[in-house]
Amino acid sequence: MKLNLKKPLVIFDLETTGLDLVRDRIIQISYIKVGIDGSEKRGDHIINPGIMIPKEVEELTGITNEVVKDKPNFKMLAQSLCNEFEGCDFAGFNSNRFDIPMLAEEFLRVGINFDFSKCRMIDAQVIFHKMEKRNLAAAYKFYCGRKMEEDFEAHRADQDTEATY
């Protein structure tokens, strides 16, 4: 895909031991760095978090404590990731609310102050939520497979209640 970029773009995703930015750790970082010339560089790292991976995370990701035991920790990868990401913009799904803050926290934890304020952040989830309707009619169509107006009068409390039921 040809993108019109002013700066390289890093499309990335993280897998973590949980959702807490302070207590949890990254166990996988995967990225595609797209250059302004359209070149692509891919990276994928399994990371030893230094803490136990909860069973539910192991089941969800397939990344187990056994898998990470001989992998590098984040500190071992941090400087090379910092160098790779320097001068780039970032994109992901739910990245503005989770992945960017988690990555920033991991960098700070190992003494690297990566300045995300100079980067554009493109969150595909935000775009999706703006492009797709997020109302009762959209939910009704998604869950019931029918248009709400075929079954109910919208914007009538009694009808909206029935549709929700």
Functional labels for PLM-detected ranges:
Residues 1-118, 133-155:
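Conserved non-catalytic scaffold segment of RNase H-like nuclease domains
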Residues 156-165:
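Acidic, divalent-metal-coordinating active-site segment for phosphoryl/phosphodiester hydrolysis
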Residues 101, 125, 162:
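Active-site phosphate/pyrophosphate-handling residues
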Residues 121-135:
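Short alpha-helix plus adjacent loop in nuclease-associated cores
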